[in-house]
Amino acid sequence: FDLVRDHDLECEAEQSGWIQPAHSPGRFKAISEKRYRQWEKHGADVELLDKADLESRIGTNFFFGGFGNKTGGHVNPLALTRELARAAAENGAVIYERSPAMSYTEEGDGWRVTTPAGNIRSRALVVATNAYTGEAAPALAPRLARSVMPITSWQLATAPLSDNVRSTVVPDRQAISDTHGDLHFFRYDARNRLITG
C-alpha cells in the first residue's frame, strides 16, 4: 500500500486487513497457527482468530479459526495495472505493447531485447508474462519453465449489497482467502458488491 500512496494510484485500494480462514481443524493447526508465529516473530501486525472470533469478523461459522494481518487489504487488479503503467510512464519508462520479446541478452550495462519489429535496449529488464509464462518461458526464461503450474480460476460479483447485509458479512471489509490449495476468496469492491472466486 506504500506504493499506492507514494504514486497516488487510483485502484480502489482498501487497507482494511486480510484474513485467512482455515477450512479444517488440521489446516488451522498447520497453517494459521504456524503463519501467525512466523509473521509475529518478524514484527507483523497479525492476530490468531479462534472459530468464534472469525465468525464475528466474516459472518459465517463454516471455518475453524484463522490468521489475520491487520495491514493487508485489497485492490482492483485491473485498475492497479493501469495505474502502475501510468506511474511508470510518468517516471520515464517506455511501455511497448503488442511487441512480443523473442529473446534477450545481457549487453554492456544493460539488455538487448529482440522483437519481431527490431531490437530494444534498456538498462533494466523485467520478465512479466503472468498467465502466459508457459508459452513464453522456454525461449525467454528457461528456469521459469519448470515453475509453471496451471491454475483455473473464476470470479463472480453480487449486486451492490445493502448496509444491513454488509453489517453481517465481513463488516470491516477485509480481504478473505482461505487455506484450500485451490483457494476461495472474497472481498468487497468500491460499489459494495461482494466479489468471490
Give residue spans per PLM region.
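Extended non-membrane alpha-helical scaffolds
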Residues: 78, 91-94, 105, 128
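Rossmann-like flavin
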Residues: 1-87
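A conserved short coil-to-beta-strand element within the FAD-binding core of flavoproteins
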Residues: 49-60, 94-111
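General structural feature for long, well-ordered alpha-helical segments within catalytic domains
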Residues: 31-35, 80, 84, 97, ...
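Conserved active-site and cofactor/substrate-binding residues in soluble primary-metabolism enzymes
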Residues: 49, 75, 79, 96-99, ...
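Secondary-structure boundary elements
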Residues: 86-96, 191
